[in-house]
Design a protein with these regions (language model features):
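Beta-rich carbohydrate-recognition and catalytic domains
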Residues: 1-82, 86-133, 138-174
Length: 174
C-alpha cells in the first residue's frame, strides 16, 4: 500500500469544526450533483451540532459544500456522526445518527431532504456515556438463508471497564 498526503478535503467553516460521518456514491444521481458523485455527510460542531454534506465530482480529491447546509438540526446537544447508506427494499437513503444516548433513523429519496423515521436505544444496552459513531449493516446468518441487521454503537466515555467502548444490537430493520 502506498499513501499520498493530500490537502484537507472539507475544511471547518462558520457552522463549526468537522466531525466524523460517512460517504456514499450516488450512482443514480438522486441528489442531482451528477451521476457517480461522492457525497460526504459530516457533523458541523460549534456550540451545537448539526449535519452537513459536501460532494465531489473528481473521485474525492476535492469537495464542494452543499449551499443549503445544515441539512439536519436538533435541539439535542449531542447530535452527530451520520452513517448513510442506500436501502434497496425501501428505495430510500437511510441515515443513522447518534443523539444523546440513542440512535435516530432518517430517510431520504434524494440525500437532501430527510424525514425522521424512528429511534432506538431507550432501555437498551449501556448508557454510562454518550452514544456515537453508529453503523448499521446487514449480515448473513451462518448456515442459513437468513440475514440480520447489526447496529454498532460506540460509547464515550462510559465503557463498562472505563474509557470508551463499543456495543452492538442484532435484529431486523425495515
Amino acid at each position: 500500500i502506498h499513501w499520498e498526503h493530500q490537502p484537507v478535503a472539507i475544511a471547518p467553516d462558520a457552522l463549526g469544526t468537522i466531525f466524523s460521518g460517512s460517504c456514499v456514491v450516488d450512482k443514480d444521481n438522486t441528489a442531482g450533483f451528477g451521476a457517480g458523485a461522492i457525497v460526504a455527510f459530516y457533523t458541523s460542531a460549534s456550540d451545537r451540532q448539526v449535519q452537513s454534506m459536501a460532494y465531489s465530482l473528481d473521485n474525492g480529491r476535492t469537495f464542494k459544500k452543499y449551499d443549503r447546509n445544515p441539512i439536519l438540526t436538533s435541539t439535542q446537544r449531542d447530535f452527530r456522526d451520520p452513517k448513510v447508506f442506500w436501502h434497496k427494499e425501501s428505495n430510500k437513503w437511510i441515515m443513522v445518527l447518534a443523539v444523546g444516548q440513542e440512535m435516530q433513523l432518517y430517510s431520504s429519496p434524494n440525500l437532501k431532504d430527510w424525514t425522521y423515521e424512528s429511534s432506538f436505544g431507550e432501555g437498551q444496552g449501556a448508557h454510562a456515556g454518550v452514544w456515537e459513531c453508529p453503523d448499521l449493516i446487514e449480515l448473513p446468518v451462518k448456515g442459513t438463508e437468513l440475514k440480520k441487521w447489526v447496529l454498532i454503537c460506540n460509547i464515550n466515555p462510559g465503557g463498562p471497564f472505563g474509557g470508551s467502548a463499543t456495543q452492538y444490537f442484532v435484529g431486523t430493520f425495515d
